[in-house]
Amino acid sequence: MELDKMDENDWKYHGEGNKSIVVSHLRHCQVLRLLKVPSEDSAHTRQTAEQTLRHILNIMDYSKHVMKPLLGEKYVHSGEVVRLPLDFLRQMSLKVQQERPELRCDKVMDTFSGCGLCLPDLTQLPLHHLRDHRPPICVEIKPKCGFLPFSRHMTKECKWKVCRFCMHQHYKLANGKWKRLSRYCPLDLFSGSKQRMYVALKNLLEEPQNNLKIFKGGELIFSCKDDAKQQPDLNNLIQHLRPYFPHTNGLYNGHQPGKVILNEFIQVICSALLSGGDSNRSGEPRKMHLSESKPHCEASPFPRDLIRNGHHGLPKDSVLAKILQVQMLDNLDIEGIYPLYKRVEQYLEEFPKERIRLQIDGPYDESFMDTVKSCLNEDDGSVEYAIGKVHQYRVAMTAKDCSVMITFAPCEEDEEHKLNLEKPRFTYSVSILDLDTKPYEGIPHQYKLDSKIVNYYLRSTQAPPPSSLYKERQECTLLFHAV
């Protein structure tokens, strides 16, 4: 990237989250992540610009020194901090403004710090030689927390039975965040059972909310509409996917080709999510099983009588297993973490300079990582134990809010890293992104939010089996084919 020749016309709006705007290069497989600031701070003092630079350096350090060792080198791309001309940033801000969702416009692009994070464009396959005319398809999934908490500190029985995502759906519906309940359950996706994973992905396609996006050649082709009242257009998605599954254009086992295409598409995603497992002597992938946590959420629409405990698990080197292992660093739940947070706060009131030694605001380096890895299992009453558990919780929260990118394209026979489906065959890559640190100061908010979510769920469900909520949408036929 030639920083002295930056031209806003070489870049296009790619998307944004709460903290940053992403723009992608028109010709190269690169994106720039540019931080956002509240509109009222857009005047930007010199101090604010320095804080922004420190923030973006923290993002890169946290990804490089904490999340990459935990999740695996092959899955995490930390990027590099780049200095950018201020005029380029100002012009870029004007260019993307008209494409930004209205609900995101409470913040503006930072145009004063002169820095950004350069990363590979994970919606593309840089090693794909484009011998095939079909551009890469990229599926972005935000899987959320894949286990039921098992902490003795929990005060409500429902938290042992119903996952956080499914409970949160009721709260978001009541607050107008979404117009319909999602039937997606993270525990189904993380189960390792191809049947349960199929159901989870099918439910994401039916109600993507902000947990599923699909790109084609780097262009967004499927996501939740800005108007949440609109249903996602599956027919349009099928038309985009049809060239990738040409053998499904006729009736297949009596089913319409559109349904068969979606079935094949889901199976490709499942195969990528389960790939990468190590093999033991028998040649079977080593599996990861949850020993302490209940493996099934009672709010999941998947029939409980079809679950065979002990027969499934995630290959230990698969992307979902890696994410789940990091999520499970939270073994106390927020109800166990909050008292430890208060212990740290009380200590800091007496010794405010200790905030630096405890690395509450970073730096996110090997020392921080050592604290996360070496925390004691038993509480000895010390502030060291408390901050160790708080840091573990923050890292686990990052993993609970990360995204998985699966990018695939039709491959040539001699290409490696391919999904071995009977037909067609795809070359693919799997990556993890959205790996920012979760703020220490956010713990009181998480504690209050947890209580609101649980209490609202208990009031709204009033004890009938949660699966009865979905009776009106259970007429679909599920297809399970060998992969």
Curated annotation (Swiss-Prot):
<dbReference type="GO" id="GO:0032958">
    <property type="term" value="P:inositol phosphate biosynthetic process"/>
</dbReference>
<keyword id="KW-0539">Nucleus</keyword>
<dbReference type="GO" id="GO:0005576">
    <property type="term" value="C:extracellular region"/>
</dbReference>
<dbReference type="InterPro" id="IPR043001">
    <property type="entry name" value="IP5_2-K_N_lobe"/>
</dbReference>
<dbReference type="GO" id="GO:0005524">
    <property type="term" value="F:ATP binding"/>
</dbReference>
<dbReference type="GO" id="GO:0035299">
    <property type="term" value="F:inositol-1,3,4,5,6-pentakisphosphate 2-kinase activity"/>
</dbReference>
<dbReference type="GO" id="GO:0007368">
    <property type="term" value="P:determination of left/right symmetry"/>
</dbReference>
<feature type="compositionally biased region" description="Basic and acidic residues">
    <location>
        <begin position="281"/>
        <end position="297"/>
    </location>
</feature>
<comment type="function">
    <text>Phosphorylates Ins(1,3,4,5,6)P5 at position 2 to form Ins(1,2,3,4,5,6)P6 (InsP6 or phytate). InsP6 is involved in many processes such as mRNA export, non-homologous end-joining, endocytosis and ion channel regulation. InsP6 also acts as a key regulator of left-right asymmetry in embryo, probably by regulating asymmetric Ca(2+) during left-right specification.</text>
</comment>
<keyword id="KW-0418">Kinase</keyword>
<keyword id="KW-0963">Cytoplasm</keyword>
<keyword id="KW-0067">ATP-binding</keyword>
<dbReference type="GO" id="GO:0060287">
    <property type="term" value="P:epithelial cilium movement involved in determination of left/right asymmetry"/>
</dbReference>
<dbReference type="GO" id="GO:0032402">
    <property type="term" value="P:melanosome transport"/>
</dbReference>
<keyword id="KW-0808">Transferase</keyword>
<dbReference type="Pfam" id="PF06090">
    <property type="entry name" value="Ins_P5_2-kin"/>
</dbReference>
<dbReference type="GO" id="GO:0036064">
    <property type="term" value="C:ciliary basal body"/>
</dbReference>
<comment type="similarity">
    <text>Belongs to the IPK1 type 2 family.</text>
</comment>
<dbReference type="GO" id="GO:0005634">
    <property type="term" value="C:nucleus"/>
</dbReference>
<dbReference type="InterPro" id="IPR009286">
    <property type="entry name" value="Ins_P5_2-kin"/>
</dbReference>
<keyword id="KW-0217">Developmental protein</keyword>
<protein>
    <recommendedName>
        <fullName>Inositol-pentakisphosphate 2-kinase</fullName>
        <ecNumber>2.7.1.158</ecNumber>
    </recommendedName>
</protein>
<dbReference type="GO" id="GO:0005737">
    <property type="term" value="C:cytoplasm"/>
</dbReference>
<feature type="short sequence motif" description="EXKPK motif">
    <location>
        <begin position="140"/>
        <end position="144"/>
    </location>
</feature>
<dbReference type="GO" id="GO:0005813">
    <property type="term" value="C:centrosome"/>
</dbReference>
<feature type="region of interest" description="Disordered">
    <location>
        <begin position="279"/>
        <end position="298"/>
    </location>
</feature>
<keyword id="KW-0547">Nucleotide-binding</keyword>
